[in-house]
Amino acid sequence: MQERHTEQDYRALLIADTPIIDVRAPIEFEQGAMPAAINLPLMNNDERAAVGICYKQQGSDAALALGHKLVAGEIRQQRIDAWRAACLQNPHGILCCARGGQRSHIVQRWLHDAGIDYPLVEGGYKALRQTAIQATIELSQKPIVLIGGCTGCGKTLLVQQQPNGVDLEGLARHRGSAFGRTLQPQLSQASFENLLAAEMLKTDAHQDLRLWVLEDESRMIGSNHLPECLRERMTQATIAVVEDPFEIRLERLNEEYFLRMHHDFTHAYGDEQGWQEYCEYLHHGLSAIKRRLGLQRYNELAARLDAALTTQLTTGSTDGHLAWLVPLLEEYYDPMYRYQLEKKAEKVVFRGEWAEVAEWVKAQ
């Protein structure tokens, strides 16, 4: 039964998106997991806690005995059936626990008794996690070109279309602004970092990569923050700035934040609840910058937002949103970005409209 335990093995698992059957407790999995992992725990949270207390009070033998007592009979068979089904569905997968210790070996032995030989990760999640951290440190040393520009300039799409681009906002499941949330909840910080490392490893492995193309992000993307090693390199990177006409930017923002988000919410929740979720999403975004707008201006824009939502609900038109979006861009987002860009003006090496920046990036 082949085990995987070298640095190159760990990297190969991440590059190949190898299915991982993670047998840690749900609370451990939620704190951090690998991108291709599914959680089928040997013990649930309560069982794990009880075994942990027993270990501290009575030692390892007593804890092991308690674990076997808690996971026995029908419960044990149900879990074996779930692991067996996952193994059959993912014949090239691998087992994983916290450190490649007793839990994954117990599951491996029970599966063997059930007629399935399945490898495990020696070193477990901890070894994979260290590999992800080290890979990010190493790969961040390659040169970086940042794509900058005001809100609505299509920076994310430009990055997505580059073979050496990494969509940080897509990985973070957040678009990096007050209105940046998506319908997918953000990952834990460790899971986000693991996903980023896997994406960088895959991108680097599939081409002769000379430099990274990333969006000009702040340290935080929603609740996730960029790894310090990557953030430090980004502060030293050259910047290409997209400068599209205001009208083009408005078209993009209308498509992304009004048409698409309304569609996504109604698709996920149905027409009635989806509409309420969509309205709450827009109001929450505006409310998040209330202090910076000032109470009077916030109240004015919130009233315009309400009017625009009423128009959209009755006519289907999103044109009414321009009444609050345009001043929000002109008075808040654009001045804020230009101020930030002025502080790193010496790093700007190219300016142009979207297509011009895309061509310039390809030539690098």
UniProtKB/Swiss-Prot annotation:
CDD domains: RHOD_YbbB. One of its GO terms (biological process) is tRNA wobble uridine modification. Signal peptide: none annotated. It catalyses: 5-methylaminomethyl-2-thiouridine(34) in tRNA + selenophosphate + (2E)-geranyl diphosphate + H2O + H(+) = 5-methylaminomethyl-2-selenouridine(34) in tRNA + (2E)-thiogeraniol + phosphate + diphosphate; 5-methylaminomethyl-2-thiouridine(34) in tRNA + (2E)-geranyl diphosphate = 5-methylaminomethyl-S-(2E)-geranyl-thiouridine(34) in tRNA + diphosphate; 5-methylaminomethyl-S-(2E)-geranyl-thiouridine(34) in tRNA + selenophosphate + H(+) = 5-methylaminomethyl-2-(Se-phospho)selenouridine(34) in tRNA + (2E)-thiogeraniol; 5-methylaminomethyl-2-(Se-phospho)selenouridine(34) in tRNA + H2O = 5-methylaminomethyl-2-selenouridine(34) in tRNA + phosphate. The keyword Transferase applies. Residues 14-137 form the Rhodanese domain. The active site is at residue 97. Keywords: Selenium, Transferase. GO terms for molecular function: transferase activity, transferring alkyl or aryl (other than methyl) groups; tRNA 2-selenouridine synthase activity. It comes from the Bacteria. SUPFAM superfamilies: P-loop containing nucleoside triphosphate hydrolases, Rhodanese/Cell cycle control phosphatase. Its EC number is 2.9.1.3. Involved in the post-transcriptional modification of the uridine at the wobble position (U34) of tRNA(Lys), tRNA(Glu) and tRNA(Gln). Catalyzes the conversion of 2-thiouridine (S2U-RNA) to 2-selenouridine (Se2U-RNA). Acts in a two-step process involving geranylation of 2-thiouridine (S2U) to S-geranyl-2-thiouridine (geS2U) and subsequent selenation of the latter derivative to 2-selenouridine (Se2U) in the tRNA chain. Belongs to the SelU family. HAMAP family: tRNA_sel_U_synth (MF_01622). Monomer. This is tRNA 2-selenouridine synthase.
